[in-house]
Amino acid sequence: MTATTPSDKDRVIIFDTTLRDGEQCPGATMTFEEKLEVASLLDAMGVDVIEAGFPIASDGDFAAVHEIAKRAKNAVICGLSRAGAKDIDRCAEAIRPAKQGRIHTFLSTSPVHMKYKLQMDAEQVYQLVISAVTRARNHTDNVEWSSEDGTRTEFDFLCKCVEAAIKAGATTINIPDTVGYSVPEEYFDLFKRVRENVPNSDKAIFSVHCHDDLGMAVANSLAGIRGGARQIECTVNGIGERAGNTALEEVVMAMRVRNDKLPFWNKIDTTMLTRASKVVSAATSFPVQYNKAIVGRNAFAHESGIHQDGMLKNAETYEIMRPESVGVKQTSLVMGKHSGRHAFVHKLEEMGYKLGQNQLEDAFVRFKALADRKKEIYDEDIEALVDQEIAQSHDRIKLLSLTVIAGTHGPQRATMKLDVEGQTRIEEAEGNGPVDAVFNCIKALVPHVAKLELYQVHAVTQGTDAQAEVSVRLAHEGRSMTARAADPDTLVASAKAYLSALNKIVMKRERDLPVPEAAAS
């Protein structure tokens, strides 16, 4: 609990939709194993409701929701469903193994959505709300209904639909700011007025779901809570469609740090926030911006001499929260080529990593090799090394060796050796530059039609011996897969990043059926 005087009426339910709305962010697709890892972490850190996916979207999504439902120890496991009978029944089947399951069904209610998206009139939508909630309630007594594009819905019609949904059995009512259009005062007033005008509003918990198109998702969510909502729908790192969703770590810490103005509490173990951020970043290959609130690299960094002087005298001069409260450690070992296995294991534990014995041995070997090539090893170096080790443990295609010949004369040439599902393949290729030669080698060794959409390089740390971190995004059959890799050799990092994205495509293609129209609530 994070409030000083907790009571049930002040408790805010944290509903995490990283695995559903977060994954709808272009390029943020996660593998089956990555989803299980994220769900396990969310469950352990005290998330109340985990929206694990959209079961009817694909066999892969269904399997992930079903497996997460079986494994969850504490959280309610929720699946998203449109208003159709097949969607609802498929969702019910996916969450059936859960100790606590929820069906989240949604339907657009705004004039623009009803006219152009649904091509239905208000009465048809109203009747569909009733039938959808009724069908969902036949499967479970924990049903959430969302009025998609609720902030642009006519007020009287919104109240009518909310009242009908509660009467049909909905226990949670979500009024989302689907397109990030609202402002805090308006969102506060909307919840206050709906609760005052819907006769049976006391029979359901109201929920906020905000997008960050105007940069106000967190502010709007907190305004909705002040207006009477008691559930916040959010994602780790704020990932999500377009500009993203409300960031879990930001709303949780806002309620904790400013409990004087936001007298609410939740069950989140805030010391796990930084670890959750890193796990989601690694799984999605979406780097966290350095100045991101709460979990960014610079969130607790002070470079100005004046600030440093103040911090040394009293940390409260420039810090409104202790870094330990969100899982950031102030003290650390200086890692280098003389560090032994014990020190390496201690550093990993300090950073929040728990590796199996084989992964640990492989990571240590790579660490020693890196330490021989760098004067100093930073935490970011180890983070990149270990995250890459975890990602590669499920790879079908692995880089064994790479040699590149480049210079001022003639085409550049690359020779590469790959392990492709246990078979060793060797190829040589030329290109217009060394990177082009490397990628041409991969195409020759593993023929594919994926198109390169993004290639970016930046240094993980300072210095001429810094590791290069390469980001690659490949487009394949209407989907984009993004991957990152780090290595002191930029060309090796490029090859590893390309192969990592290719591995994601291979695994996704094997698991999924064609995806229907994406949901957005």
UniProtKB/Swiss-Prot annotation:
Pathway(s) this gene product operates in, as recorded in its UniProt entry: Amino-acid biosynthesis; L-leucine biosynthesis; L-leucine from 3-methyl-2-oxobutanoate: step 1/4
DNA-binding in keyword set: no
Annotated ranges, domain Pyruvate carboxyltransferase: 12-274
Cystine bridges: none
Cofactor: Mn(2+)
Regulatory domain: annotated segments: 398-521
Coiled-coil regions, chain positions: none
GO CC terms, sorted: cytosol
Matching SUPFAM superfamilies: 2-isopropylmalate synthase LeuA, allosteric (dimerisation) domain, Aldolase
Catalyses which reaction(s): 3-methyl-2-oxobutanoate + acetyl-CoA + H2O = (2S)-2-isopropylmalate + CoA + H(+)
GO terms, molecular function: 2-isopropylmalate synthase activity; acetyl-CoA C-acetyltransferase activity; manganese ion binding
Pfam family, one: LeuA_dimer
Keywords linked to the UniProt accession: Amino-acid biosynthesis, Branched-chain amino acid biosynthesis, Cytoplasm, Leucine biosynthesis, Manganese, Metal-binding, Transferase
GO biological process, one term: L-leucine biosynthetic process
Subcellular compartments: Cytoplasm
CDD domains named in the record: DRE_TIM_IPMS (cd07940)
List of residues binding Mn(2+): D21, H209, H211, N245
Subunit and partners: Homodimer.
Physiological role: Catalyzes the condensation of the acetyl group of acetyl-CoA with 3-methyl-2-oxobutanoate (2-ketoisovalerate) to form 3-carboxy-3-hydroxy-4-methylpentanoate (2-isopropylmalate).
UniProt family annotation: Belongs to the alpha-IPM synthase/homocitrate synthase family. LeuA type 1 subfamily.
Protein name in UniProt: 2-isopropylmalate synthase
